[in-house]
């Protein structure tokens, strides 16, 4: 009986220190919920919404091509697929985990 009483605090610590299963479940996160989740996961590191390739391409398209800038930016099929996987597509249109959210941290 004494051994049980000595092990009880350890069992309680292990029980309460295991991650909540709800936090590990993939979730749909859209709008302000997505931004709040990113702030929570990334903290002071900050975050971005799109992969760097897409941001570079959007900037070139907004400013317009100069001296054939877009010639060097032709996308391969793999790169095009990466562009389609922004955080909204990954976490709002589909579901994402905390680990996937963390991939958008700076």
UniProtKB/Swiss-Prot annotation:
Entry-linked CDD domains: IlGF_insulin_like (cd04367)
GO CC annotation, single: extracellular space
UniProt-annotated location(s): Secreted
One Gene Ontology biological process: glucose metabolic process
Main location: secreted
Gene Ontology MF terms in the entry: hormone activity
PROSITE patterns: INSULIN
Range of residues in the leader sequence: 1-23
Keywords: Carbohydrate metabolism, Cleavage on pair of basic residues, Disulfide bond, Glucose metabolism, Hormone, Secreted, Signal
Disulphide connectivity of cysteines: 30-92, 42-105, 91-96
Propeptide boundaries: 56-83
Function comment: Insulin decreases blood glucose concentration. It increases cell permeability to monosaccharides, amino acids and fatty acids. It accelerates glycolysis, the pentose phosphate cycle, and glycogen synthesis in liver.
Subunit structure, as described in the record: Heterodimer of a B chain and an A chain linked by two disulfide bonds.
Family: Belongs to the insulin family.
Protein name: Insulin-1
Name of the gene encoding the protein in the UniProt record: ins-a
């Amino acid at each position: 009986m004494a051994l049980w009483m000595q092990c009880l605090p350890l069992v309680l610590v292990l029980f309460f220190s295991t991650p909540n299963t709800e936090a590990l479940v993939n979730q749909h996160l859209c709008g302000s919920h997505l931004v709040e989740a990113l702030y929570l996961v990334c903290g002071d590191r900050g975050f971005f919404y799109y992969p760097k390739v897409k941001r570079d391409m959007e900037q070139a398209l907004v400013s317009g091509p100069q001296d054939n800038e877009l010639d060097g930016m032709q996308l391969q099929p793999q790169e095009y697929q990466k562009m389609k996987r922004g955080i909204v597509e990954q976490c709002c249109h589909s579901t994402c985990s905390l680990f996937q959210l963390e991939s958008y941290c700076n």
